[in-house]
Swiss-Prot record:
GO terms for biological process: valyl-tRNA aminoacylation. A motif ('KMSKS' region) lies at residues 560-564. It catalyses: tRNA(Val) + L-valine + ATP = L-valyl-tRNA(Val) + AMP + diphosphate. It comes from the Bacteria. Residues 886-954 form a coiled coil. This is Valine--tRNA ligase. Keywords: Aminoacyl-tRNA synthetase, ATP-binding, Coiled coil, Cytoplasm, Ligase, Nucleotide-binding, Protein biosynthesis.
Length: 954
């Protein structure tokens, strides 16, 4: 029985992918089975911010996650990929504030809190939908009915529950402390949201008069204090010297008069002071500097806050003791002339006033790092504010132990050290933010300022016996976005309820994330999860067993992708394509720095003169997997993307060759397996083993290489060719065997490839399954190929390997000698071992057809051979007589010309690379390209010289 199928000339990704995905989703193939008898496998997606669209980093990480989910689903595991989005407090509020400012010329205050939050929910509905659709285009096999948002009702309940319990345990407290304050966004931000920028500044040297007639060792009646922040002078509460600095030892415990404010402040000794910095005397301003804050605590200094939340000088100083309570016994009046001044205007005035008083010693240029808020984009101010904190040290101990004892493993392992360094030096976590968008802090205040924490106002009243006559107001602040994200693995599964999902899918198996949020998110998830989730024996549960840390995706030059550089590539543009005009509009529109638009447009036109061609999702996924070397950053390469699109086409064409073959015979008669049939089964079996080992160790790059190597170099380039003589001249039994092997290896290959390239494999599998006698609705629930000891066949692999080497050697001789493929050659073999002689006898006809040989002869040891081109294969010498095929002199002249040309190219590049100025100035990528060219030219030169010698010896 022969079978034949009609198949399109090429795979049309744009026509197939979305239709296939819709079919999968409608059929419910992505849902977990909830079969308790199966092993569970789950991944919680790092929730993308609801603020915008997916970028290459998302596409990269989600491709790896989906690969693992599909791989485990095909192994029969009960799989859950828990997806969702993050409310992203500051980022989302900023986006919507900018939107209403641009479109309506309004601020959030014009709307009021409730109406503004409604605006954000509208934005979330729009933006969240965009992200979900983009994730579908990537082929992500997510159970969309379980999609979550960090401010869903269920997750909000979990957040309140955690806050209340931690507060009851004394691990959440409210206190006045120094925080990073963003004066533009009016909120506290974490250290990790602060970007230190190099800046050319000044170091001002001010004279602080000594009080009560004191003098320095040199007889001066003042100390010179060096500072980079004159605007905070009014908040000084001490000056400090190093306790071992002999210049000032006699002055320790005495006082200076603070200029402008005219109050006495002490001279304290503290090892924090660097004797080499400035004069070795520094001013201490505990309310406006983190180091000074610590010095102030050590010396019990008052904290004088002279700035408003706008970073203007206050009308009246706020004076706080080291216990965080108001201090009424200390006086620090702000002079009238400074009140209400913007901070940098105040700086100028302070310097001018010191100068006019004769107290400005000198000004020095000084390089410094200025801390900026990464979202607000303005210098942050250390600010004394009332904030909520989590005391994390007790939580950190358990989390450190989990990694030390191997309950959680980092891949690559080096990231464990980064984790430990953060966790062993952990500070209390400021969890309150002065925003409107987010989880509102579940705390209420009465008119006397008493604080009540509870899950709701009703609970607070009931628990504390507060009737309706007691007025309560809820805390205005919201929680840090990372607080709710830290609960992600268990809150999405229904906690605090004890759901079947929580029992079945927690802990999750792996977290795939970037190194930049190991502390922001990973560490906090470990701490929170282990504190709240316990197994049946009361042992803390980890949120995940493995943390796979990815590198960054950079552009082809190794630059980080960013809007300001104009080098961002949208993953969907590589899938669907984009014309140049639209690409330019995307890269240069809505820029924070519009002056860069022209430069970006020029670079884009050079890189993508025709825009970006469509490549389809499978090609993008395969490229991302192939580039995923463990933990390393990836330099994006469009040529690799094109190459892997060609790979997908190769798989399609190979399938088309098999399924449209007129001679294909899958009838039930006798089958006589050829050497090639046994070989391809053994090779595929080995590929399955290597592929599975690679994925089990998160080596997506090695898995992709295995798949590519087998599909292109073994199945397509060799096995399909080796079957052609069988279909042309074989017996019925041999044709049936080749047909059976072709179809069955192809069907298994599609299953092997499915986790990486789901669309094309499903499309082909739907056509091949009937040929292979396989039942099932979809490839994604078919069993994943397993290694089979019975298919190991080292003998067949060795024999075909030798046959391939001989055929390749003959083909190389033909190409090197410019002999047309239509001309038959004779092959002489000398020193042929017995095993290879036997292989030759059994496969002589096949080898003659494949290498286009008229004859094959084994020479005796002492038998003379005519003038021939020779190659070695193992210990055997291959000789192809050249008489009548080439004109020796003409061929040598041609080769000599080619050799001279390459020598010239090598010298040119040697000159470039030997030029120190070029090497110093040229980008690394350009130098690497030149070295690569040099290697190619040198290898080419070697081959040409070898050809020259071969022909010269004829």
């Amino acid at each position: 029985m022969t079978q034949k199928l009609q198949m399109a000339d090429r795979f049309d990704a744009s026509a197939v992918e979305q239709a296939l995905y819709n079919h999968w989703e409608q059929k419910g193939y992505f849902k977990p089975s909830y079969d308790a008898g199966r092993p569970s496998y789950s991944i919680a997606i790092p929730p993308p911010n609801v603020t915008g669209s997916l970028h290459m980093g998302h596409a990269f990480q989600q491709t790896l996650m989906d690969t693992l989910i599909r791989y485990h689903r095909m192994q029969g595991d009960n799989t859950l990929w828990q997806a969702g989005t993050d409310h992203a407090g500051i980022a989302t509020q900023m986006v919507v504030e900018r939107k209403i400012a641009a479109e309506e010329n309004k601020t959030r205050h014009d709307y009021g809190r409730e109406a503004f939050i409604e605006k954000i929910w509208d934005w979330k509905a729009y933006s969240g939908g965009t992200i979900s659709q983009q994730m579908r285009r990537l082929g992500n096999s997510i159970d969309w009915e379980r999609e979550r948002f960090t401010m869903d009702e269920g997750l909000s309940e979990a957040v309140k529950e955690v806050f209340v319990r931690l507060h009851e345990e004394g691990l959440i407290y409210r206190g006045k402390r120094l925080v990073n304050w963003d004066p533009k966004l009016h909120t506290a931000i974490s250290d990790l949201e602060v970007e230190n920028k190099e800046s050319k500044g000044s170091l001002w040297h001010f004279r602080y008069p000594l009080a009560k007639g004191a003098k320095t060792a040199e007889g001066l009646d003042y100390l010179v204090v060096a500072t980079t922040r004159p605007e905070t002078v009014l908040g000084d509460t001490a000056v400090a010297v190093h306790p071992e600095d002999e210049r000032y030892q006699s002055l320790i415990g005495k006082t200076v008069v603070l200029p402008l404010a005219n109050r006495e402040i002490p001279i304290v000794a503290d090892e924090y002071v660097d004797r080499e910095f400035g004069t070795g005397v520094v001013k201490i301003t505990p309310a406006h500097d983190f180091n000074d804050y610590e010095v102030g605590k050590r010396h019990n200094l008052p904290m004088v806050n002279v700035m408003t939340f706008n970073a203007d000088i206050r009308e009246e100083a706020e004076i706080i003791g080291t216990d965080g309570q108001p201090l009424t016994t200390y006086e620090a009046e702000i002079p009238q002339d400074y009140r209400g001044l913007e901070r940098f205007a105040a700086r100028k005035k302070v310097v001018a006033d010191f100068d006019s008083l004769g107290l400005l010693e000198k000004i020095q240029p000084h390089d410094l790092k200025v801390p900026y808020g990464d979202r607000g984009g303005v210098p942050i101010e250390p600010m004394l504010t009332d904030q909520w904190y989590v005391s994390v040290k007790p939580l950190a101990e358990t989390a450190i132990k989990a990694v030390e004892e191997g309950e959680i493993q980092f891949v690559p392992k080096q990231y464990e050290n980064l984790y430990y360094s953060w966790m062993r030096d952990i500070q209390d976590w400021c969890i309150s933010r002065q925003l409107w968008w987010g989880h509102r802090i579940p705390a209420w205040y009465d008119e006397q300022g008493n604080v009540y924490v509870g899950r709701s106002e009703e609970e607070v009243r009931s628990k504390n016996g507060l009737n309706s006559s007691v007025a309560l107001r809820q805390d205005e602040d919201v929680l840090d976005t990372w607080f709710s994200s830290a609960l992600w693995t268990f809150s999405t599964l229904g906690w605090p309820q004890q759901t079947k999902e929580l029992a079945m899918f927690h802990p999750t198996n792996v977290l795939i994330t970037g190194f930049d949020i190991i502390f922001f998110w990973v560490a906090r998830m470990i701490m929170m999860t282990m504190h709240f989730i316990k197994d049946e024996n009361g042992k803390p549960q980890v949120p995940f067993k493995t943390v796979y840390v990815t590198g960054l995706i950079r552009d082809e030059q190794g630059q980080k992708m960013s809007k300001s550089k104009g080098n961002v590539i949208d993953p969907l543009d590589m899938i669907d394509g984009i014309d140049l005009e639209s690409l330019l509009a995307k890269r240069t529109g809505n820029m924070m720095q519009p002056q860069l638009a022209e430069k970006i447009a020029k670079a884009t036109k050079k890189e993508f003169p025709e825009g970006i061609q469509p490549h389809g999702t499978d090609a993008l996924r395969f490229t991302l997997s192939a580039l995923a070397s463990t933990g390393r950053d990836i330099n994006w390469d469009m040529k690799r993307l094109e190459g892997y699109r060609n790979f997908c086409n190769k798989l399609w064409n190979a399938s088309r060759f098999v399924l449209t073959n007129d001679k294909l015979d899958l009838s039930t008669g006798e089958r006589e397996l050829s050497l090639a049939d046994k070989w391809i089964q053994a090779e595929f079996n080995k590929t399955v083993q290597n592929f599975r080992n690679a994925l089990d160790q998160y080596r997506f790059d090695l898995a992709a290489t295995e798949l590519y190597e087998f599909t292109w170099n073994q199945f397509c380039d060799w096995y399909l060719e080796l079957t052609k003589p069988v279909f042309a001249n074989g017996t019925d039994a041999q044709i049936r065997a080749a047909s059976f092997t072709l179809v069955n290896v192809l069907e298994k290959l599609l299953r092997l490839a499915h986790p990486l390239i789901p669309f094309i494999t499903e499309e082909i599998w739907q056509k091949v399954k009937d040929f292979a006698g396989v039942e099932g609705e979809t490839i994604m629930t078919q069993p994943f190929p397993a290694f089979d000891e019975a298919l190991v066949n080292d003998e067949a692999v060795a024999q075909i390997s030798w046959i391939k080497e001989v055929i390749t050697a003959v083909r190389n001789i033909r190409a090197e000698s410019n002999i047309a493929p239509s001309k038959g050659l004779d092959l002489l073999l000398r020193n042929l071992p017995d095993t290879e002689q036997k292989t030759l006898e059994n496969n002589r006809t096949l080898m003659q057809i494949m290498a286009k040989l008229d004859s094959v002869k084994v020479l005796a040891q002492d038998e003379e051979a005519p003038l021939s081109v020779a190659k070695l294969v193992g210990s055997a010498e291959l000789l192809v007589p050249m008489a009548g095929f080439i004109n020796k002199d003409t061929e040598l002249a041609r080769l000599n010309k080619e050799i001279e040309k390459l020598i010239g190219e090598v010298k040119r590049i040697e000159g470039k690379l030997g030029n120190e100025a070029f090497v110093a100035k040229a980008p690394e990528a350009v130098i690497a390209k030149e070295r690569e060219k040099m290697q190619d030219y040198q290898e080419g030169l070697e081959k040409l010289r070898a050809q020259y010698l071969s022909i010269e010896n004829l």
